[in-house]
């Protein structure tokens, strides 16, 4: 690394809604600072996963150090790229805590969107210097002045220093680099000499083990130091090496000092040992108080993941363990289902997190898997005063001992064009939402604030919102509190046998509609047998919906040519008795497609 001057360091992040050009601007900055040679350049360089490139999103935070000559001085610019999605908001808040400034990228044609709003508020809470960037000015629909006014009116940011640019053509990129140097302050000189470093991410490398990404606040960290983690009060570890992101992770001689961003490797075995937001200090001269803001990340959404072929169980176990090495928020617990066999109960930060894990298992490990319907954590308050936390219908206790149920609610902000207001209000009403306020964002768009049950969000809220707003609506949410709710267990019985994989916890008002739609779907996907099969939806043993798969009919009187009707009746009676016995002892085989089809039900 080049000469160290604290006043020449700039640590910044990029805040943007999905598809507003964050990764492309990062590419242009890397090009302009010659961090990456032209022949090695490719689109979305910091997005290392194929999934990130395809979806146009950032899943893991990717830091990079750039050097830029300006007015005869060399400046060290540390970009800490952050995930943009609401599922990863804690990671975003820790990445922002490692910075002094942020670039707010807004599409000059689309304007401010919900997820960029959420992250701007996180940056404002940290008192960061925010530079608005109006991207995509090369588009015919771009209206930078209108978007500038939108940022001033709704977010309350001064847009005097806003920069209009086009990441596609490279226009305005040098102005962005100059603004980073002139407007974002350097790190504050440390008041203490003891090591304090903020962990903002970690990564498992098969060759060197766990790489811990840090921003050094005070002191320095170097090879040979014995360090410990303050919030989790873990064991002591020896630092085996320190490095920087140039842009690839590269080991360096010397140390990481106050204000710098880099990583260290130690003899750490699991990512779970490293908590994002924790403070690193030395054993010899420990810091007195840790950095504030640390909290444990707990999963919010749960789902069962099962292999379609039961012989793939060990491969699935290995796949999940490997994913967990790089994803400390993913929780795994072995479980078994009467219908699906052995699998895993997994916890996720949100629906996008679930989708990403599901997709990575299929792609990277070539496995065929089934995921059960996503569920949230409910509180069950029992009559004896105890409280249970359940995320699985199989853990639902006997209804006679339940005092009441509580479900998690979230605060939701929806940004939409005005003409879709009534459609969104109907959608939120259908999802049991409570309207808090409606504000104008500009002449054409509104911000709606709602309280909604989390269970309604994790099912299909995003798809329905995109559908009713023709793709123009966006939303973000943050966890609120628990509230009483009439949550009940809906059981599905096939041939009078309950099938646990189809059971779910639903609100009483929606139970009948949900039960009916599952029964109707199963009638279409379960093949006919020689006996009729009843499919029932039941609550507490009371059937609320029923469909019947008709028996395959076999013509037992085909050999009777004319003749006496009593002969035919005797054969029909014998057939009826046989079918009755088959119904008692016959097993209904449920195809895998049935489980997948039920998951598709809204």
Curated annotation (Swiss-Prot):
GO molecular function list: GTP binding; GTPase activity; ribosome binding; translation elongation factor activity
Catalysed transformations (reactions): GTP + H2O = GDP + phosphate + H(+)
CDD domains: EF4_II, EF4_III, LepA, lepA_C
Enzymatic class: hydrolase
Subcellular location: Cell inner membrane
Database matches in InterPro entries: EF-4 (IPR006297), EFG_III/V (IPR035647), EFG_V-like (IPR000640), EFTu-like_2 (IPR004161), LepA_C_sf (IPR038363), LepA_CTD (IPR013842), LepA_IV (IPR035654), P-loop_NTPase (IPR027417)
EC identifiers of the protein: 3.6.5.n1
A UniProt-annotated Pfam family: EFG_C
BP terms from Gene Ontology: positive regulation of translation
Keywords on record: Cell inner membrane, Cell membrane, GTP-binding, Hydrolase, Membrane, Nucleotide-binding, Protein biosynthesis
Gene3D superfamilies from the UniProt entry: 3.30.70.240, Elongation factor 4, C-terminal domain, Elongation Factor G (Translational Gtpase), domain 3, P-loop containing nucleotide triphosphate hydrolases, Translation factors
Lipid bilayer topology: Peripheral membrane protein
Binding site for GTP: 19-24, 135-138
PROSITE patterns: G_TR_2
Cell membrane among keywords: yes
HAMAP family xrefs: LepA (MF_00071)
Family as reported in the entry's similarity comment: Belongs to the TRAFAC class translation factor GTPase superfamily. Classic translation factor GTPase family. LepA subfamily.
Protein task: Required for accurate and efficient protein synthesis under certain stress conditions. May act as a fidelity factor of the translation reaction, by catalyzing a one-codon backward translocation of tRNAs on improperly translocated ribosomes. Back-translocation proceeds from a post-translocation (POST) complex to a pre-translocation (PRE) complex, thus giving elongation factor G a second chance to translocate the tRNAs correctly. Binds to ribosomes in a GTP-dependent manner.
Record-given protein name: Elongation factor 4
Protein species of origin: Chlamydia felis (strain Fe/C-56)
